[in-house]
Structure formats: structure tokens, C-alpha cells
Amino acid sequence: QYTQILIDSRPIFSSLAGVYGIEQLPANMVDRVEVMRGGGSALFGSSAIAGTINIITKEPVRNSAAISHTTTSIGGSSAFHNTTDINASIVSEDNKLGIAVFGQNTAKDAWDANGDGFTELSKISGQTLGFRGYVKTGLYSKLTAEYHHLEEFRRGGDNLDLPPHEAMIAEQTDHGINTGSV
């Protein structure tokens, strides 16, 4: 509740989105994670009283590309979690220009473990994409640009075919986050 999540030292998620948001970040974009515990992190704002998690994205260092797809059966049932990840980096021969792009598509079926009609795991549909690029303008200087787009729909509870206000119990979030910097 009081932990601020940052991407490249910038706040991306609200307190509520932070509960679910970390799940939207593809691992293939992460270079490292910095954790600052306690009140000293409050300089990042009121959401950071308990601490700050700063996710640093990868900077392009060599030409590369990768794609992967994972399908997981949830609890041995007919519910599945599908994730597709894509990333690529292009760097000029003199290392003065570089760009890294990444993306993830996630689709997870709702799962009712005990058959009571209420989901234990929500249905999720999400997409994440972004890039980080640089131009070295001098021996000790560089201009960096980055963009991140996160979009997710999540629905749990019962009667998933009905609008949330008509269900007995409903959990639903639908958000899109866009951020960038130069």
C-alpha cells in the first residue's frame, strides 16, 4: 500500500495499480531491480513511505532478438495462462546509437478451484510494450529516450458474463498507462 513502484526512476503505477502492476512487466525488459526500504524513500512521494522498488530497464548493448511463448495449465484444469514475450536490440557499429524494444501479451483464464462459482484467479488480458534508445552526443554524454505502454483488463468474482454491478461479487480493473521521457 505504501510502496512506490518506479520504472527507470519514474512513478508509473498508482497505489491500486501497483498491487497488480508488477505482474504486467515482462522480465525480458528488466536489467536490475533497486529496492529502497523504509522512510528514506519518501522523497519519491507519499506512496513511498514503506519503500521504493525501482525497475531499471535494459539498455541496448549489442544486436539481438528473442521471442518466446509459454502456456501453463492452471491447477491441472482447462484454464490456461498464455504469455508471449518479444524483445530486440539494435546498436550501431560505433556504439553511438542504440535502441531496445520489448513487448508482452498475456491472456489468463479465470479459475475456480473449488467449483463454488467464484474465481480464485481472475481472468486477465494484458499488453505491455516499450522502447529505450540512446544517442551518444560526446565522450561523457548521452541523450536517452524511453516509452512504456501498459494495458490490462482483469475480472474476477462470479457471473463473469454479466456486467460487474450485476454480479454478487466482482473484482475488475481496466487501465492503460502511457509514459515516456527524454
Give the positions of each predicted feature.
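Outer-membrane beta-barrel translocator/receptor signature
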Residues: S14-L16, M29-D31, A42-N54, K58-N114, ...
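Short acidic/polar hinge/loop motifs at secondary-structure boundaries
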Residues: R10-R37
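Short aromatic-centered micro-motifs
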Residues: I5
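Flexible loop and strand-edge segments within Gram-negative outer membrane beta-barrel domains
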Residues: K108-T128, Y134-K136, Y140-V182
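Residue-level recognition of strand-loop junctions within catalytic nucleotide-signaling folds
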Residues: G38, K58, H148-L150
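Exposed beta-strand and adjacent loop surfaces of beta-rich binding modules
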Residues: Y2
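Residue-level detection of beta-strand-connecting loop/turn positions
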Residues: D8-S9, L139
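Outer-membrane beta-barrel domain signature
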Residues: Y20, G40-F44, S73-S77, F118-E120, ...
